[in-house]
Amino acid sequence: MSHLADSRLSNTALSVLDLAPIRQGGSAADTFKETVALAQQAERLGFSRYWLAEHHNIEGIASAATSVLIGHVAGQTERIRVGSGGIMLPNHPPLVIAEQFG
């Protein structure tokens, strides 16, 4: 890789989008621990943002309460910015969305 390309990549902000998948044989509690571990590793590697997406009624996905999971991850990281990578707007009153994510 050329020096110019290398310097451009080093200035690129990287993010993670986590759906909090429950691996086969695992539990939601395992997933939450793994999500925190992934966020901490992303932070150590210099990623700038960690996004969590909301999903409901999907077997194998544990991110139904996005705002709670965001707080859980943010409370166990130091610098990485943690936020919502997707909210199902019809499922929530507008004021709740504004208060939690505004």
Predicted ranges, named:
Residues 29-34, 90-102:
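Glycine-rich anion/phosphate-binding loops
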Residues 1-82:
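N-terminal beta1-alpha1-beta2 module of alpha/beta enzyme domains
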